[in-house]
Amino acid sequence: GALTLFAQLAIAHAQFETIHPYHDGNGRTGRLLLPLLLTAEGYPPLYLSGALLRARSSYYEALASVQLRGEWGPWLQLLSRAVVESCDESIAIARDLVTLVERWEQELGRYRAHSATRRVPRFLIGHPVLSVQQAAEGLGVSQPAANAALNNLLAAGIVSLVSERQWG
């Protein structure tokens, strides 16, 4: 039968690390393959590198177990723990973002419910760095309306100005 996506991830990473194609950066590149493969299959790009590096010695031992003895068990167990840990981290971040947006929306409560000012906070989650033009296009409003909305958020301390040139 076909291999599960988890098995494909485990094999791809272990093979990449075994081949070690570059002089430098193989570990980073190999860990970057994991979220890219997930995304290619339509899944969210879990950031597994952090969890793997927090268990650095176990990570190296598990890969060596595959490379030197063909023993996949330790690597599969470690990778599965990293997936669970990464999912937990992603859920916590998503909850924190929801809480942040709700707080911003409360702070902006004096503005009309469907105004550009009230809609910007949710848009910021997917676009944390943006120009007035990007805000206007994303919110479906004029550039002056987007500029006014961003100025309201600037006054509320929700956004900050990166540079005058980028703002206008």
Predicted regions and their residues:
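Basic amphipathic alpha-helical segments that dock to polyanions
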Residues: 124, 146-156
